[in-house]
Every structure is written in C-alpha cells, then in structure tokens.
Amino acid sequence: MGTPGEGLGRCSHALIRGVPESLASGEGAAAGLPALDLAKAQREHGVLGGKLRQRLGLQLVELPPEESLPLGPLLGDTAVIQGDTALITRPWSPARRPEVDGVRKALQDLGLRIVEMGDENATLDGTDVLFTGREFFVGLSKWTNHRGAEIVADTFRDFAVSTVPVTSTSHLRGLCGMGGPRTVVAGSSEAAQKAVRAMAVLTDHPYASLTLPDDAAADCLFLRPGQPGLPPFLLHRGGGDLPNSQEALQKLSDVTLVPVSCSELEKAGAGLSSLCLVLSTRPHN
C-alpha cells in the first residue's frame, strides 16, 4: 500500500501550451488586467518549459499557441489529473471552454483515461482543485460550483473530496498549495487563512502548515519526477518574483527548490499551477 501521500507529485510528463500574440491584445484589458509585455511573457513561458524538461527531467509536451485561445497557456484549468485518469473540466468562462479540446487529445495520446463532465450546470476550473496525496479539496469560487465539485468526487471515488469556500476572486490554488506530502503552504491573506482553517476542520489527516507573506507564492508544485527515494522538487515563484516569500520557502528543507518567474504571465491571470499539467504515464503501485 505504501505511505499515505506518497503518490503526491509523481510525474513523468508535463504539458504546456505556447503563448499566443492575442494574450496581449485585448483579452487582459477586457478583464481589467494591466497591459502585458508579450515578449517577456513568452520568455517566462520558455524558461518554465526549460526547467520542466532540463531541471526536472520531465518529458515535455508543448501544444502550439492558438490565437483564438488567448488564455490557452493557462491549461491547468482544463483538466484534473490523478493517476491514469483525467477529468476534462468545464471552465466557468464560456470563451475558455474550447481550450479543453487540444488538452483532451494530448492526454488521450499519452494514454490517460478521459472523463467528461457532461453537465451544463457544472462549472469547474482545474486550479480550484488541490490534491494532497490523500484527498481532494475543491474550492467553491467564482469559477467552480457545487455541481463541479460533485463531479470531481464522482470521478475520483478512491479519495475523499471536500469543498472549501473561496472568499476572494482567486482560485483555491492561488491561495494555498502543497509544500510536501504533509505540508500545506498558504498565503497570509484572510481568504487564504480561511481556506486553510476550513481544510483543517474537514480533513482526517494532520497537515503541517507554512504561511507565506504572498498568496501567489503558495501556488507551487510539489513534484517527484524520479524514482522513489530521490529528493522531490518544489517548483515555485522566484527568480525575482515575490521576494518577501523566499526566506519562508527555505523552511521547506525536504525539497529541492526550483524557482521560476511568471510575473508577466500573472498579468493575464496566470498562477504557476495554471501554466502546466503534470502527469505520470508510468505504472502506479
């Protein structure tokens, strides 16, 4: 059976999607977001892909940019993946729903079992779903409703699934993440702390917690691309981003920290976990 939580972060592949020019031409402004430097955003995205491939040793699958999908690089919202199963989401924004098509095909090609939501009353953004290795928490937010959370529970029946109110405009994973199999990291805002308190009440598992000054710093990815026994990685915001949170992240001594910047992509609403999907095509014990 193994140790509870040991499946967290197991991965062999990462999926990303290129940054289209349309990301800088109206989509952000229409959403009230600041102007975006396209070249810088594309550089950030290229560095992220390089770290996933070279530093973490993952097989990188890169979908081409599509001008009709300005927010296509935020493909973390399009699927929830655990083991060999991928739940294709139904994003809250109707304009984003075509983003799932290319992701679905890529995941099928990698051999994952595809589950469709199939309920027009459900909304689900993938970055509202936090998997701890033992259970799922689904943020009930502007982006994700109760029906979406119910479909997560129906899809991943081997795990407990609990809902957590998100009281800000963020997704759940924009407020908290996993710094290890037993450690929840969270921002210091009231919304982030409320979410962590709710999770503590709902869970049957004890998690340590680490509070970071910046909510966005808690949007990190705990990854174990190697074989069991090798040190895991924590892909996190750094490289000049969120300097106030870097010292606190050093307290996570059981991981190798891999910093990456996405401050320009953040202007389009991207958090770190929205910019890639990680999965394992290796057999699971």
From Swiss-Prot:
Q: Which UniProt keywords apply?
A: Cytoplasm, Hydrolase, Mitochondrion
Stated EC number for the protein is 3.-.-.-
Record GO cellular component, one term: mitochondrion
The subcellular localization recorded is: Cytoplasm; Mitochondrion
Query: Is Mitochondrion included in the keywords of this UniProt record?
Result: yes
Q: Does the keyword Oxidoreductase apply?
A: no
Entry's family note: Belongs to the DDAH family.
Kindly state a single biological-process term from the GO annotations of this entry: positive regulation of nitric oxide biosynthetic process
**Modifications made to the protein after synthesis:** Phosphorylated by TBK1. Phosphorylation inhibits the translocation into the mitochondrion upon Sendai viral infection.
Name the InterPro entries on file. DDAH-like (IPR033199)
Origin, by domain of life? Eukaryota
Q: What broad class describes the main subcellular location of this protein? A: cytoplasm
Species, as recorded: Bos taurus
- Explain the purpose of this protein: Putative hydrolase with unknown substrate. Does not hydrolyze N(G),N(G)-dimethyl-L-arginine (ADMA) which acts as an inhibitor of NOS. In endothelial cells, induces expression of vascular endothelial growth factor (VEGF) via phosphorylation of the transcription factor SP1 by PKA in a process that is independent of NO and NO synthase. Similarly, enhances pancreatic insulin secretion through SP1-mediated transcriptional up-regulation of secretagogin/SCGN, an insulin vesicle docking protein.
Instruction: Give the annotated active site.
Output: 171 (proton donor), 276 (nucleophile)
Q: Which GO terms describe its molecular function?
A: dimethylargininase activity
Protein name in the entry:
Putative hydrolase DDAH2
